[in-house]
Amino acid sequence: MRETPEREEEPGTEAPCAASCHAQRILQTLNAYRRSGTLTDVVLRAGGRDFPCHRAALSAASAHFRGLFAAGRPERAAAVVPVGPETPGTAAALAVVLDYVYGAGVRLRAEDEAAAVLALAERLGVAGLREACARFLEGRLRAANSLALRRVAAAFSLASLAERCGRVLRQAFVEVTRHADFLELAPDEVAALLADPALRVAREEAVFEAAMRWVRHDAPARRGQLRRLLEHVRLPLLAPAYFLEKVEADELLQACGDCRPLLLEARACFILGREAGALRARPRRFMDLAEVIVVIGGCDRKGLLKLPFADAYHPESQRWTPLPSLPGYTRSEFASCALRNDIYVSGGHINSRDVWMFSSHLNTWIKVASMHKGRWRHKMVALQGQLFAVGGFDGLRRLRSVERYDPFSNTWAAIAPLPEAVSSAAVAPCAGQLYVIGGAGQDGVNTDKVQCFDPKEDQWSLRSPAPFLQRCLEAVSLEDTIYVVGGLMSKIFTYDPGSDVWREAADLPSPVESCGVTVCDGKVHILGGRDEHGESTSSVFTFDPGTGQVEAQPSLQRCTSSHGCVTIVQSLSR
């Protein structure tokens, strides 16, 4: 019978799992030898306990022992090698490390044990155990231990654990601040936590109370940190009654002279609303309150229909919410602005004197006192808690007329007229004064004049002319700088009243006029308007003064131009 030759294995092939199973059996045998003291050639001593081991196994798994047992080192022949520090915790941690080295797996029971094992594994250079400890800690992460684990993450550069700790701190801020670890934070850590715009708090009162709880934990030593911490509390978002009863009446704050400017800023915001311009008046990202952009009325694509809609847009969620329609919506080319979180709309075609207020609290439109002079193509802005209706057109001529509205007395009064009559100009308040930029003059010719009103002196003056001659302009102010767009210009221009200097800020993707412009979340938003073909658009762009970048945003719900556009703070749960 002919023998069949044995089939030769191809080089490099092996039975499935043969190598890994073989390695596992070797580790299991070595671990059994370690536990029984068989063939061990070194003893590790930690916390009063001895651990017989094999130098070869330790050297294979640990960079520290590999170097320690290298040829020429005096410790190479040592029978006993101490592993510090000499504490019971070190012994327990070393037991876990050796189980890992010998393939017995990692069994962790508590966060402090995992932190001790992690520290020892780092010292001994045991690769892989670091990741196992990090995964265990991530699985045990809770609000109660988030601050402690954040310190562990920082100490050992565990990026994933640090990110998860930060998320828990933001999402469970109120619960975190109730634990003792919060009271032991360093001032820098408390300030950084309070400053986070993404804290998930329903009310800013929770942030204020956390700051004061930390200070009162050791008031004599910490009262000097009050101003620094209070800078990160958004005092204008507190309920006015709470501010009076809990903040201004607080003895620690009364004794802190450095805190007084912050309290005065909050008071100004209660009186003036967003006009005060305080960054601390912006709601945090995940509050129920948020800045929303309100778009009111306007003309359709061809300019034939007057749109009745009023809608609020939340940029963070990109969600539109309908509001009650503007009464008398058949008017166009009216003016709008926000004052103390209410929206005012005045005038409109043809020659209307009407003024309506949208109460954001009552969610309804209320008619208030009419202007003395009917007008459209004018502008209206808020300055020092009052409204100013500026210039415009009455059907016969462009107007020099300026009227001031006092919301407390519900009355309009004429003030010093414009040096030069204009309509369709850009108007913006900035640094306590009123600026009227460009527009169409009495002869119908566009002007580049910048007319400045000082309310203290009830007097107008001229400033440096604009670098353009345009009408149908819009302007807003942000941090003592005026931003001008529209007039079918392809650029955004800035004007600094302090230096009386004009600059080009950015290029726009496409020119528009009679657009809506407002400031929301620290950015300039440009909404709708007419393009170079005279048609209304639905385009939306944002300009970030910090980066100088213009970005396209989701379009409006419909094409519109000559519309009202303001920013208010609104509850998102409505």
Curated annotation (Swiss-Prot):
Which SUPFAM superfamilies does this entry report, sorted A to Z? Kelch motif (SSF117281), POZ domain (SSF54695)
Question: Keywords, A to Z?
Answer: Kelch repeat, Repeat
InterPro entries referenced in this protein's UniProt entry, alphabetically? BACK (IPR011705), BTB-kelch_protein (IPR017096), BTB/POZ_dom (IPR000210), Kelch-typ_b-propeller (IPR015915), Kelch_1 (IPR006652), KLHL35_BTB_POZ_dom (IPR030601), SKP1/BTB/POZ_sf (IPR011333)
Q: Which residues form the BACK domain?
A: 146-248
Keyword match Ligase:
no
Kelch repeat feature ranges: 292-341, 343-385, 386-432, 434-480, 481-522, 524-570
According to the entry, every stretch annotated as the BTB domain falls at: 40-110
Pfam families per UniProt: BACK, BTB, Kelch_1, Kelch_KLHDC2_KLHL20_DRC7
Its recorded name reads Kelch-like protein 35
The organism of origin for this protein: Mus musculus (Mouse)
The record's gene field reads Klhl35
